[in-house]
Curated annotation (Swiss-Prot):
Family annotation (InterPro entries): RemA-like
Family classification: Belongs to the RemA family.
Organismal lineage: Bacteria, Bacillati, Bacillota, Clostridia, Eubacteriales
Leader peptide range in chain numbering: none
Domain of life assignment: Bacteria
Organism annotation: Clostridium perfringens (strain 13 / Type A)
Protein name, as recorded: Putative regulatory protein CPE1749
């Protein structure tokens, strides 16, 4: 089984197999999801102090903040430029 990894900006990489949604942080429901994840300790801030432009939701209920546009992350997800790690299980 191979693990597909996606760069979400500034050298941060997440497993593409675990992504559920990539959304914009502008709406009130998404802001509420971010706050609830922060309260639960499930928020990962990968913005390096920059403005949050994409919110990535994973199947483990982690919420990841990225400074890269959602369209850019989605494009990286659909291209062949991703890092693939072979797992010997």
């Amino acid at each position: 089984m191979s693990i597909k990894l996606i760069n979400i900006g500034f050298g941060n990489i997440v497993s593409a197999n675990r992504l559920v949604a990539i959304v914009s942080p502008e709406s009130a429901p998404i802001k509420r999801i971010i706050q609830e994840a922060r309260d639960r300790g499930m928020l990962i801030d990968a913005t390096y102090g920059r403005r949050t432009r994409a919110v990535i939701i994973t199947d483990s209920d982690h919420v990841i903040l990225s400074a890269v546009q959602p369209e850019t992350v989605a494009h990286r997800l659909s291209t062949k430029e991703e890092v693939v790690v072979e797992d010997d299980e």
